[in-house]
A protein has these predicted regions:
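N-terminal helix-turn-helix
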Residues: 1-81, 245-249
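Amphipathic alpha-helical effector-binding/dimerization core
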Residues: 63-157
């Protein structure tokens, strides 16, 4: 037996549908788009209009700013650090490796949080530290989702080859960034430092914009890079999705 409330479920479907519409829309279109019969759509819209949630103009409906005001209140009380902390700890417990939260600061990735792995082996990284974008997994995530003009300017400058695996040639780096966007994550196999392996994923806000990155770092030896990444990448992706959902991402 289902514990769901059909009227509430229908209401949330209508609100979600209206939020995705770029213009005012009529009852017939809402009914087709949501799969809810017209009579139910009309009654729900009438209730939402009375409560100030939707606006009706010539029998076409749109959401009012009331909903956005309600949503912004809890978000304004939550900082990215507050939201991410328990998720990072969970990621640390599941992988045993160092975890971090980073944002773009000018042409670097800035670590807002960094927790050492349970093995007590300190991987490069500290809260407040700033690191290159092109040769680190979190950096590549942020660079890949930056403005096109910024990417062009950044990839056109001379980049230091920190290790033999660092990608410094423009065309190769642009292809790497394309792969990051396509795959939904970035990896770093000893590109930042010898023996250091990383995987990172983007964090999205309610508008679909990448605002941060979360990931894991570990020490690897004897060519274990990809094996290590395969081990903790699913947890990294799950952590990024969890934070994004709290921020209102779809």
């Amino acid at each position: 037996m289902s514990n769901s409330a059909p009227a509430v479920e229908a209401c949330t479907k209508i609100i979600t549908f209206l939020a995705e519409c770029e213009q005012e829309i009529g009852i017939s279109e809402i009914s087709r788009g949501t799969g809810i019969n017209k009579n139910m759509v009309f009654r729900i819209l009438n209730t939402l209009e009375n409560e100030g949630w939707v606006y009706c103009n010539a029998q076409k409906y749109s959401l009012t700013l009331l909903l956005f005001g309600l949503v912004s209140k809890p978000l304004s009380r939550l900082s990215l650090n507050t939201i991410a902390s328990p998720v990072l700890y969970d990621l640390l417990n599941k992988t045993g490796e160092s975890t971090y939260l980073g944002i773009l600061k000018e042409d670097k990735v800035l670590y807002l949080q960094h927790f050492d792995g349970v093995k007590n082996v300190r991987v490069a990284g500290r809260v407040g530290g700033e690191y290159d974008l092109y040769c680190s997994a979190p950096g590549k995530v942020l660079l890949a989702h930056a403005e096109k003009s910024f990417i062009e300017e950044y990839t056109s400058k001379a980049l230091e080859k920190r290790t033999k695996n660092s990608i410094t040639e423009k065309s190769a780096l642009l292809q790497e960034l394309e792969n990051v966007r396509k795959n939904g994550y970035a990896t770093d196999c000893e590109e930042f430092g010898n023996g250091i392996t990383c995987a990172a994923a983007p964090i999205y806000d309610y508008s679909g914009k990448v605002i941060a990155t979360v990931g894991c770092s570990a020490f690897t030896t004897n060519g274990e890079c990809m094996e290590m990444i395969e081990k903790f990448l699913p947890y990294v992706l799950s952590a990024a999705k969890k934070i994004s959902l709290i921020l209102g991402a779809k």
